[in-house]
Structure formats: structure tokens, C-alpha cells
Amino acid sequence: MILLDTNVISEPLRPQPNERVVAWLDSLILEDVYLSAITVAELRLGVALLLNGKKKNVLHERLEQSILPLFAGRILPFDEPVAAIYAQIRSYAKTHGKEIAAADGYIAATAKQHSLTVATRDTGSFFAADVAVFNPWHD
């Protein structure tokens, strides 16, 4: 079971997406793939920060009408149990000289709570958080 990081789920939206990543996404059994609420927030923020125009409108529509509906019932919240894991992950990393970005920590904690592998290109924070990681660009 897989939790997609923002850079993975957004890859097909790029003007020239990585073919390997797109093929990997297409090979997945959708019911085994999840998003975190944090990833949804990052995706929506990315669209909101674009200048008004056709690109913003197209990306907004693709996100809200095509991508997010695919994950209905499989968008995992940042709740109290995940918050407790987040605090453990970030404090452990910090006391051991490792840095985990806040958003990556939220996503890592969500993965840990639900025993999921994180699919991401940015593996460092997730390795530091001691969660299972898969990089569809290289693995």
C-alpha cells in the first residue's frame, strides 16, 4: 500500500511528465494508493499561487474534477494519532542531526500511522523518518 507524495501525484500534470513515473502510476491498483490531506493542501496551494489564466484554470479543473475524485475515501487526515507520530519523528531526527521539513514530516507520520510506503522523489526526509520509501524515478 502506497502513500503518494506531492511530487509523484503532480508529475502527470507537468507539461513533459517523466514517462517512467507515469507508467508506474498507471500500473498501480488504485485501491492500494492513498494521498495525505497535506499533499492535497500542497496541490491546491500550488494551483492557487499560479497567475489567473488558462493554465491555472486547466490545472484547477484537472485536480478537482479528475485527480482528487480518484482518491475519494483514500485521503488520509492529519489527526491526533498522526500528530503524536509527527512529534516523535521530528524530535528524533533533530536530536540525531537530521532535518525533516514540516510537510514531509506530516506525510511521513501519516505513512507510519497507516503502515504505508511513501512514493517520492525526495527520499531524504522519509529515510530520516524511518518510513518505507519508493522512488519511481529510479527504483
From Swiss-Prot:
GO biological process: migration in host
Lineage: superkingdom: Bacteria
Keywords per UniProt: DNA-binding, Hydrolase, Magnesium, Metal-binding, Nuclease, Toxin-antitoxin system
Annotated positions binding Mg(2+): D5, D104
EC number(s) per entry: 3.1.-.-
Cofactor requirements of the protein: Mg(2+)
Domain PINc: 2-123
Observed phenotype of the null mutant: Disruption of the fitAB locus leads to faster transepithelial cell trafficking of the bacterium; mutants adhere to and invade cells normally. Mutants grow normally in liquid culture but much faster within human cell lines A431 and T84; these latter 2 phenotypes were observed using MS11A bacteria with a disrupted fitAB locus.
One Pfam family here: PIN
SUPFAM superfamilies noted in UniProt: PIN domain-like (SSF88723)
Alphabetized GO MF terms: DNA binding; magnesium ion binding; RNA nuclease activity
Subunit structure: Forms a heterodimer with FitA, 4 FitAB heterodimers form a complex that binds to promoter DNA. The complex is also seen in solution. This protein does not actually contact DNA.
Family per record: Belongs to the PINc/VapC protein family.
Function: Toxic component of a type II toxin-antitoxin (TA) system. Plays a role in the speed with which bacteria traverse human epithelial cells; disruption of the locus increases the speed of trafficking about 2-4-fold. FitAB binds to its own promoter better than FitA alone. The expected nuclease activity was not observed for the FitAB complex, perhaps because FitA (the antitoxin) prevents metal binding and thus catalysis by FitB.
Listed name of the protein: Toxin FitB
High-level lineage: Bacteria, Pseudomonadati, Pseudomonadota, Betaproteobacteria, Neisseriales
